[in-house]
């Protein structure tokens, strides 16, 4: 299960408190803001997952960096809805991480799919 900067607030507590039994990877911005409960719910969900789980928070990114918006228009930068990491490399690098995660858990291809991303982008990674 892969989640790109998804919102956990509307997810019912039964799911948050049970977690899931399949591998899980969350990749997203460093913060949703000081009043958001999103990461509190994500952390509880992560703790309750019953398989490998990752939380990758990338500093200087925003929600729309995890979409195709940077390819479509430079308007995101002007409106300040894209972070500083938005550039022509971020989406391809993000795609490599996504592909690496799925290759590991669907094809048993055990290459280190986080290492290059971690070297290039200021990020925090939580794994269990």
What are these model-derived regions, one by one?
Residues 60-128:
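Alpha/beta-hydrolase-fold serine-hydrolase catalytic core, especially in secreted/extracellular enzymes
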Residues 1-63:
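The feature captures the conserved acid-bearing segment of alpha/beta-hydrolase catalytic domains
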